[in-house]
Amino acid sequence: MDFKSIIFVFLGGGVGSLIRFTITKYSDKNLISFPLGTSISNLIGCFVIGCLIAYYDKYNIPKKDIYLLVSVGFCGGLTTFSTFILDIFHMLKNENLLTLLSYFSVNFILGFLFICLGILIFK
């Protein structure tokens, strides 16, 4: 791994993290039990990475600098698996089973569909 790759991942991760912070701050303001911001961030990340993979495959572009910037950096900073699991832990602890099932389903099912949508758009 060279220094340029590290910079690309660092910059993309910073932007993705700031966007996730902003989404979460404004979308979770009035919600008590459903962490909408994490879901929105994860779904956007799934869509972006689906688009990116399909675009690179369609035009046979080598996965280098911009790919690192967007997929590893931006999507890595934007999406948040650890927060997702922590949210599920709190829902289980507080016995919010219906919310837990909804949250789990939204993130996994819609996440998969958003990746597929991104791929279909660029195929």
Regions found by a protein language model. Give the residues of each.
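Membrane-interface helix-loop junctions in multi-pass transporters/channels
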Residues: 1-123
